Swiss-Prot record:
Binds a second Mg(2+) ion via substrate during catalysis. The lineage of its organism: Bacteria, Bacillati, Bacillota, Bacilli, Bacillales. (2R)-2-phosphoglycerate binds at Q162, K338, R367, S368, K389. Catalyzes the reversible conversion of 2-phosphoglycerate (2-PG) into phosphoenolpyruvate (PEP). It is essential for the degradation of carbohydrates via glycolysis. This is Enolase. The keyword tRNA processing does not apply. It is an enzyme of class 4 (lyase).
Length: 429
């Protein structure tokens, strides 16, 4: 019934018009699972390798090598495997690749297969993916972390911080949270328009206006929240992804906030965050310092770790070895989970489990280059992660995840839980 009979990959396009890998896995029963692989713009130094072809085709971004690796190398190995053996299949692909960073076959090849196998198995058993992956206890809907103003690598403007987000923590359900976030998004558009700013959207569906400073972004969002009829700090909190590795200059060891004309040391960056947290209802800061600035991260954790979620993205790259190092050193209190940073579902689930055991939160995340694939929505519920970061309520590649979460909440009925502020279980409120 669940024996794999065929594995097939093709090259398709992601939301930025760049090629990516799509994989289909076919089972004896006739069931099929399909998965598409996402891709990031600002990538951590220690991420698993995304295989690109180079050359002139698609400006070097083609993925025919990764597709060939699925069709010629991985497929013959997996035919005959039971799709229910997710751990065995993922382990076999890791061994087949044989490198620390999946650089031989490509994390984009391996991940596509890993996700498609899970979907095929769920379809064969006639189970929703979140139930197949998480069992009967999978019932917590995540608080959305909605990126509504873009800066940094995600936009061409004077804003240094990559993402300014809203989190509707005061809602009673996911449906209400999504409505809150969406109303604020539309309110923000009006506010920006009234100030004469551009309202075109960036990679993740958020606006990318040419604001004069990072603080103006926060002030504008507060205005939008209030104009939408919500209370900042109570019903809606703010979150930021600084993506500091993009601001860090290795030569002088300083952070260059070119939009503001500032050059700051690690200590000055921490002081900058303390100032912002004192002024605005910020509940989460991601990658506040460079991925190799462990001393700076420790300082930030010591100063703000009790009241602000400090998320490691480039810092931990969904990697249990990096996360273990962070836990041991008391660095950060949360991990961002991106399936393509590590490359298999098994390793993704291992990272989430390790984080939770250590009292860290886990935030399930999209990438800036996304597709219509909504697997991460199911993963968020399957693992009861409590938080999801998947862009603004704009662009189908982002909304696909939100719509899937609405379906899941509907399906769960009275069993569905939305924990709001309780999702930040390790903060001393």
């Amino acid at each position: 019934m669940t024996i794999i009979t065929d594995v097939y990959a093709r090259e398709v396009l992601d939301s930025r018009g760049n090629p990516t890998v799509e994989v289909e896995v076919y089972l004896e029963s006739g069931a099929m699972g399909r998965a598409l692989v996402p891709s990031g713009a600002s990538t951590g130094e220690y991420e698993a390798v995304e295989l690109r072809d180079g050359g002139e085709r698609f400006l070097g971004k083609g993925v025919l090598k990764a597709v060939e690796n699925v069709n010629e190398v991985i497929a013959p190995e997996l035919i005959g495997f039971d799709a229910l053996d997710q751990i065995g299949i993922d382990q076999h692909m890791i061994e087949l690749d044989g490198t620390e960073n999946k650089g031989k076959l490509g994390a984009n090849a391996i991940l596509g297969v890993s996700m498609a196998v899970a979907r095929a198995a769920a379809n064969a058993l006639d189970l929703p993916l979140y139930v197949y992956l998480g069992g009967f206890n999978a019932k917590q809907l995540p608080v959305p972390m909605m990126n509504i103003i873009n800066g940094g690598e995600h936009a061409d403007n004077n804003v240094d911080i990559q993402e300014f987000m809203i989190m509707p923590v005061g809602a009673e359900s996911f449906k209400e949270a999504l409505r809150t976030g969406t109303e604020i998004f539309h309110s923000l558009k009006k506010v920006l328009k009234s100030k004469g700013y551009n309202t075109a959207v960036g990679d993740e569906g958020g606006f990318a206006p040419n604001l004069s400073s990072n603080e103006e972004a926060l002030q504008t969002i507060i205005e939008a929240i209030e104009q939408a009829g919500y209370t900042p700090g109570e019903q809606v909190k703010l979150a930021m992804d600084v993506a500091s590795s993009e601001l860090y200059n290795k030569e002088d060891g300083k952070y260059h906030l070119s939009g503001e004309g500032k050059v700051l040391s690690s200590e000055e960056m921490v002081a900058f965050y303390e100032e912002l947290v004192a002024k605005y209802p910020i509940i989460s800061i991601e990658d506040g310092l460079d991925e190799n600035d462990w001393e700076g991260h420790k300082m930030l954790t010591d100063r703000l770790g009790d009241k602000v979620q400090l998320v490691g993205d480039d810092l931990f790259v969904t990697n249990t070895k990096k996360l273990a190092q962070g836990i041991e050193q008391g660095v950060g209190n949360s991990i961002l989970i991106k399936v393509n940073q590590i490359g298999t579902l098994t390793e993704t689930f291992d990272a989430i489990e390790m984080a939770k055991r250590a009292g860290y939160t886990a935030v399930i995340s999209h990438r800036s280059g996304e597709t219509e694939d909504s697997t991460i929505a199911d993963i968020a519920v399957a693992t009861n992660a409590g938080q999801i970061k998947t862009g603004a309520p704009s662009r189908t590649d982002r909304v696909a995840k939100y719509n899937q979460l609405l379906r899941i909440e509907d399906e769960l009925g009275n069993l569905a839980q939305y924990n709001g502020l309780q999702s930040f279980y390790n903060l001393k409120k």
